């Protein structure tokens, strides 16, 4: 007889290899056919709502690793929430206006000068939709579940209509104003930029020390002194109207090289060194406030430069006397307003000097640096020229330097709502906690928000002008424009005359003849996405404001978190979110930024093509995403190895359930043996830990707990030990059904617990669970497992955890014996232990077969104590152990070594247990 035929070996169609790149798209097709998103929403209808509001990615180009990290994190949360008592809709969105799309079209050869603004905007819209379709497919390939057929898009009419209402509401509260003000200006984009559109990069600039001759010393100075300033922007010298000093600082009048100079006392030493005064002496000391209203002379124009006082002056660098050009700096502008100085800005929108800078008109500002420095040298005002490399603001899109330039712009007042904003920040939960400090400081220190842009592709600023140039914004005009946009989209603004955009019969005191013009600037794109709390959360029936969570990269403290907060507090007085969670950036394996030049870019599409989305998702779960994270082929290899172990654990459990029906074969929990109950108690512990980790967005803990449970608790212990029962015993034997009961409960619970992270694999496992109690087609339509009721659970855990420590000792002794060639496999061993007293009682209380638990052929507890163990025994923590080769023959069926093999003459190669099973169940 072939005894192999009498073994109950595992059977399952669940494949050992994931082959995810091929299998995942098939699974996704199935989800689409069953309309899984709608099914989940229907099943969870009426539960408390949990809204994770999607920050919209920009609709341009393929998705990168940062997108993948972001969308997968969101998906894990949404999937978990919908399996734990919430209705968790997920509406993805796209940000679609702005310069990158204009630039992309220009690169494609579109000549925007040859068409109307409205025509150009139609091409922009078409391009945006193409990009959305491309990105949507890539996001879906990641396994992200959402309302992909009805996303929110910032260029959709209903979105724009709500955005106009946000603007109108802010205007009504006096928070929108038009003003001349220095703003970040990008000559390369020919537009104003918001702070969120600025990035700092190193730039080489000239560093000059310039002497301004004193014209009127106002009785404090004699009139033969020269005030020394320092600047790295010589091109702003033509716009100089003042010199700022700090009222409370001491200033020296210094004599050097036969001349007298004014510098801050604290900086005199460093200035002398820098400009090369070898012998210098202090003639007089004065306070900054004494110098107020002293008149100096512009170095090369016939014009005065007034000494003014400003709190912004520091002694960090320079001379303590600050060159002040109100048209080219925020502090300069503010101090200029205080002293009634004009706002002079002799630079045009392309960065070229104008006629207001005689002698330099027509020069690009950066080129003018040289000519102006030469002019200063000619007139004897230049004390020193050198070059420095410093961190300087650049346009985040064109990567070119920006300048400060005073222009007429539309602003949203931050100042008027600053206290409310800071209160709203306090009431929000920020994770990580440093996020709160970061956004608090940003809001505390930021200026008013410049919301106008001089571009074509964006939402128009809905303002009309009367015949006298007065801006008109009324409830009536806002309501009308909002309705027009809802009906026709914002292109209508560029297709119609002002009169056709106003309500029928509209009149206004500023236009006695009924003539109106319209604003041509558009809104900053951050105003677009920043209005989503109204344009999406309020607009849609399935969502609500405030959202439970905003989750984006840490660059969004100054971006979307900030603009959303500003508009929401302005309109509603409250934050648009209850909680904000931020993640770091994706770096390469060595912690470097990814760049084409370094050749270290990891592309999500490629990872999915080679390894699958579930591997990428498992990587996301494995990292500490609140800081910057690393990815490389090597890191993904390690993650794939963990995936393989988890998958193999599932496969083993599924394979050993092939003949198990939980409705008929399950053993009630109360009737299970201690070890089986212990495993269910361990499963209970896992369920509690994993759910707690999901609740606190600690996915790395989920990853580690699941990995540990599969490899240590299951594979290395219970499943290994259970083979002897599962394969060897008769099919319907009580011990075998007990183990299968544990496996069934475990496989169902693990499939659910891992489903938010590995949705494809979890559903594949789900399909292969034989005779499932829950007859639903996807694990996504179930809830997270609940712990089972187990009598005396804590005592059980304490007892068996203690046994596991003893087992570790014995395994160590077996390992040593194997290395010393005393035994081969552990089943060839006979083990004798000499326990410490408390361990003796523990071993005596165990009813299970200790041979089976330790996978050895003979096991005995010696009468002698630990201390009295013979010299040959290996002394370990809890027991002393002697390992010898087991005596007897090897049973052909179960591989146990015993002297009793062949006792049943009809089965000369079997042990009595196997002979009995074969006689009872397999004899013809």
Curated annotation (Swiss-Prot):
GO biological process: isoleucyl-tRNA aminoacylation
Cofactor: Zn(2+)
UniProt main location, coarse: cytoplasm
Residues engaged in binding L-isoleucyl-5'-AMP: 552
UniProt keyword terms in alphabetical order: Aminoacyl-tRNA synthetase, ATP-binding, Cytoplasm, Ligase, Metal-binding, Nucleotide-binding, Protein biosynthesis, Zinc
Cofactor-binding details, from the entry: Binds 1 zinc ion per subunit.
Comment on protein domains: IleRS has two distinct active sites: one for aminoacylation and one for editing. The misactivated valine is translocated from the active site to the editing site, which sterically excludes the correctly activated isoleucine. The single editing site contains two valyl binding pockets, one specific for each substrate (Val-AMP or Val-tRNA(Ile)).
UniProt-recorded name of the protein: Isoleucine--tRNA ligase
Species of origin: Geobacillus thermodenitrificans (strain NG80-2)
Lineage of the organism: Bacteria, Bacillati, Bacillota, Bacilli, Bacillales
Gene (name only): ileS
